[in-house]
Amino acid sequence: MSSQKDGVPYPFQLSSKAVPSSTNGTTVDLNLPLKNVRGRIPAIQASQLRSMMLEAYNDPSKIVAHVCSYDGLSSRLVEEAGFPVVFLAGYAVASSYGLPDTGYIAMQEMCNKIQETVRMTSVPVMADGDTGYGSPMNVKRTVECFAAAGAAGVMIEDQTWPKRKFYLSWSKIEGNLSSAVAGCGHTKGKSVVSRGEAYARVQAAVDARNQGQDIFILARTDALIHGWDEAITRAREFERIGVDAVFVEALPDRQAMRRCVEELQLPTFANIIEGGKTENLSASDLAQLGFAAVAYPWTLVAAKLKSIRDTLDGLKLSMTRGAPPVILGYSEVCKGVGFHKYWVGIFLIGADILLI
């Protein structure tokens, strides 16, 4: 799918972004050798994602930005904007159900979202596997099912299940009930499993990849809550087990970010949550620090909340003042949701259609 013509171009050019194809450009030549394959059964999108990540890892002027989407339309818009990958994050997907990211979403619901997104996009799709939904055998099944659904990558973390504890406190000064809630791994009260259980999860994920369909494996640790040594010890063991990339969650500042990259010998992820615990740096700054990728878990969720609320306020105001405001033209909305492709398809198969 082509990127948005009139939008801002993606600032980091990745030579490995192109998908290998046959000379006529209509089908993929399965005889073409895929680069950077790690699974028993090669997968084009996993190969492409891994190649992009390694390219960015080896070039401090590049970084792979993972904008976290939540459904087919938002994912397609991410691709149309020129981003090289789509990330179905647990926080964003849970929000599409009107729920917080606290373990409500099950594996099959994520698989459904993966299939929905893969049908709507052509770039690699990373998917959030959370804790793997149970024992190491559940982790293995999660990775296998995500790969079968079309995911190019999966993230597995070492938080406990249920994922988070929430602490409610009564504020006498404010006179209301408030909860200590933030987002994703920046949530207060989170806890992690033991090293042994964390390693078993990651080993199960790697085994699923090595014994089956190839898939990029990102291992995440939230163990920074127990100190630097604990987090890096886990990250290094994840690396030894054989993951493709590591994500140490909630690194506070540039110094910690640089140290993390220097102490690991594989692609690393950064996580930018506006207003979160991590210093809010530009993608270019993160690339210079040595990160291969950066994720934006709730940028689109925040945009959705604000835009819908603002639009509803505008609609209410218009009810006593005149016609409702035109946000987008009719044809632009139809094109945005895919009607133009439907009309082209109908035309090509020779069916009668009334073009509006």
Question: What would you call each of these model-derived segments?
Answer:
Residues 3-46, 297-356:
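Extended, intrinsically disordered, low-complexity segments
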Residues 25-296, 302-303, 309, 313, ...:
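Alpha/beta enzyme core
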